[in-house]
Amino acid sequence: MAALIQTIHGGVVVTRTLTLVYPSTFTSRHKALNQMTSSSNSGLRRFLFTPPQRLSQGICYWGAELSNNVSWTYKTKMVVRSKAGAVPLMKHGDRFLSSLSSPALAGDPSAINRHIKKFVAASPKSVALNVLSHLLSDQTSHPHLSFFALSLYSEITEASWFDWNPKLIAELIALLNKQERFDESETLLSTAVSRLKSNERDFTLFLCNLVESNSKQGSIQGFSEASFRLREIIQRSSSVYVKTQAYKSMVSGLCNMDQPHDAERVIEEMRMEKIKPGLFEYKSVLYGYGRLGLFDDMNRVVHRMGTEGHKIDTVCSNMVLSSYGAHDALPQMGSWLQKLKGFNVPFSIRTYNSVLNSCPTIISMLKDLDSCPVSLSELRTFLNEDEALLVHELTQSSVLDEAIEWNAVEGKLDLHGMHLSSSYLILLQWMDETRLRFSEEKCVIPAEIVVVSGSGKHSNVRGESPVKALVKKIMVRTGSPMRIDRKNVGSFIAKGKTVKEWLCK
């Protein structure tokens, strides 16, 4: 059963969905609230500032008393995250997870456990931990298999190379909370507390990981309990380091839970405790507002950062761009790119990715590589005013120069880290730039010209690189002499003089 939570932020109504999972016997006796309205002073603050109770004891939430038959999972319809993706899988681990999904193992817990045991026994430490980390990630590409993370971890603990890792435990506890396996998460938590409670710093860092992991997984109960433990430490600790780390995690966690207003209150509390908020806290709040589309609040935080001596850097500027892009605010994105010149903030590959992934014309063009423009001048004729400004600002930056190596031996363009749209624009820029260099009388002509596209090891489908397909298609359509390198299938190569003849003909 779902409840709608509406919060008003600066005139913008943000609606979230809170899912309440009831057994049928419980729903026959209780009616859930279909709609809940909370101000920025309520909601998660109840969890943060009052002692939480285990579900077995009952939870009172916004006046609704819930018995031990109710479980909580936090979901939002407005998650606009700057996704780095799940932990990349090694090839061996990818094969293992594929086999774990096979029909032969379906519905047979004993067979699955034997399969997991065999995998851990036959795998090196790096591979086994890689698979576990992938399953624990809130961005995992195998969410249907994350249920087996605990079984995998249990087998790993039996390995001779196993070292107890509190960060890994925090991530596993958070996943179990998300899956509403509270007895199992409580067992792991109790063990961790027993091992770490004698060392205040280690225990605090564990709780910090627990707060952030629960917030990423969307577990209200796990987040509130870990936050309450951190508050207890803040109240009794005399260590500035311990208090700072605790506050940082609470700010980050609240922003992950779409509560940037409450996160700002924590920052104010830091000031009262004579602890100076750092750039990390401000970035968290800035992006928390931004991904919710609360741009007035986002810009207010940007201004405050400047007045307090925190320099706007590339990471911060990319957060702003990502926020605008997620809400199709292209005019604001263009204005922000122009402001960055005044801040002397350099662009990065991620700047390209954030901006170009938000340009609908370019994204649409790249769906048909047989008809997309193959020159920068041609591309500009298809763009609307907003997109044309964005492309202009990007092409005036130094990102292309940083992606190029140029000497007598080799002239190389490296497209690693670039999304398809960024690779497209950079490639068009590169052709113009290379042509310009070749036209100079004193230009050094490299023996070889190389374009590195990658072979698809990090693509959504292993071995299928959209960037490689893009480069190949454009090379064919423009009559380029560059061909796939036999020694490196993730690169295109040709003699420098041949490339000069092609571009300067």
Curated annotation (Swiss-Prot):
The keyword Repeat applies. Residues 413-503 form the Smr domain. Keywords: Repeat. PPR repeats lie at residues 243-277, 278-312, 313-347. The keyword Repeat applies. Pfam families: PPR. PANTHER family: OS02G0120000 PROTEIN, OS03G0856100 PROTEIN. Belongs to the PPR family. P subfamily. This is Pentatricopeptide repeat-containing protein At2g17033. It comes from Arabidopsis thaliana.
